[in-house]
């Protein structure tokens, strides 16, 4: 079978877990995949598809945020027409980043990473809400198959988008255990939160909890990583922003941190807790969205709306560090990208056997 995978809206270092997913999926399919693959990539991320055969599309502003996103998608749509001839030999097209470009009449598979714009619309401006409803919702409804990352997203998508439950397939993300692995480092008195400062990431409440912890633990520090953290300035004493860091640096931080704290208000999956667990780092995380489903009993869960609960969970994670380390290593071992890739291949076969739906092309 011949499968096209679209990564056309990938913006390096801007999409967080979605970018990790896209890169790991294509890299793994290049190694273990049993079908013939072609990846459609933007010039700005021409290396994103690992070892797959690629079709490069001129750079577009499609991954920009805010009110400019919809006109940017119009530009992307025009440019994606340049590659439509490359679709002729395919059987299925997978929109790994949800946005349905390039358009096609072939059966499509859509990865729907979450439906946050439906569950928490207040976190999106009018332009982004409209964009997601136009691009994400329509793509999912027109797809022969929809891939979601958790039972949580599956339930919300079926309810809110009125999708056929039989067409929605849960395929969890994986962990690259060749990279995320435990070390012999001594734990240090800092807690770690790797996240861009998007509203649902809940930095303000974490910082409030941290200032309370510092009252009794003055040596404790909070380290933040991720792009755009300058928006949080000025930061209180004890809080340090490291900005965007390399994978090697984040692994080193996981191995040394007293714990990972993950206070997100909404996640369709949530990779950092699993990556931290794979490095032997204790985890304290929100009890919302897909996070409890992903973490199982290997993390201390808390109410992310309660700063006192966050602080208490950090203390509990520290007290139970040895237990959580062992539980976390076992939990993370259940998630691997090879399994994720093989489950994707099952969905591609299922989609190809369905009557073509696709996203109609325009002249």
Model-found features: residue ranges?
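Carbohydrate transferase catalytic cores enriched for Leloir-type hexosyltransferases
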Residues: 1-363
């Amino acid at each position: 079978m011949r499968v096209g995978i679209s990564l056309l809206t990938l913006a390096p270092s801007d999409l967080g877990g979605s970018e990790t997913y896209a890169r790991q999926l294509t890299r793994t399919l290049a190694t273990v995949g049993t079908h013939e693959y072609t990846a459609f990539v933007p010039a700005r991320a021409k290396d994103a598809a690992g070892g797959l055969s690629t079709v490069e599309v001129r750079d577009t502003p499609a991954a920009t945020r805010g009110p400019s996103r919809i006109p940017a998608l119009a530009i992307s749509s025009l440019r994606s027409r340049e590659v439509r001839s490359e679709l002729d030999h395919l059987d299925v097209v997978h929109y790994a980043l949800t946005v349905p470009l390039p358009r096609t009449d072939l059966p499509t598979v859509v990865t729907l990473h979450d439906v946050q714009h439906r569950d928490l619309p207040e976190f999106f401006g009018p332009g982004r809400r409209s964009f997601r409803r136009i691009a994400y919702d329509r793509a999912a409804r027109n797809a022969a198959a929809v891939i979601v990352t958790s039972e949580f997203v599956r339930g919300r998508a079926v309810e809110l988008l009125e999708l056929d439950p039989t067409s929605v397939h849960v395929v969890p993300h994986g962990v690259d255990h060749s990279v995320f692995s435990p070390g012999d480092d001594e734990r240090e008195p800092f807690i770690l939160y790797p996240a861009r400062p998007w509203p649902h990431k809940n930095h303000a409440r974490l910082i409030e909890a941290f200032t309370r912890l510092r009252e009794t633990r003055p040596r404790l520090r909070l380290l933040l990583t991720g792009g755009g953290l300058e928006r949080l300035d000025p930061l209180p004493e004890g809080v340090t922003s490291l900005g965007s860091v390399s994978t090697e640096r984040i692994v080193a931080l996981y191995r040394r941190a007293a714990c990972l704290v993950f206070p997100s208000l909404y996640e369709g999956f949530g990779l950092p807790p699993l990556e931290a667990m794979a490095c032997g780092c204790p985890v304290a995380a929100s009890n919302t969205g897909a996070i409890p489903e992903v973490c199982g009993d290997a993390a201390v869960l808390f109410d992310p709306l309660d700063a006192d609960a966050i602080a208490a969970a950090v203390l509990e994670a520290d007290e139970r560090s040895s237990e959580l380390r062992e539980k976390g290593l076992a939990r993370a071992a259940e998630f691997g990208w090879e399994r994720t890739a093989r489950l994707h291949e099952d969905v591609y076969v299922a989609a190809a056997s369905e009557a073509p739906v696709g996203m109609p092309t325009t002249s």
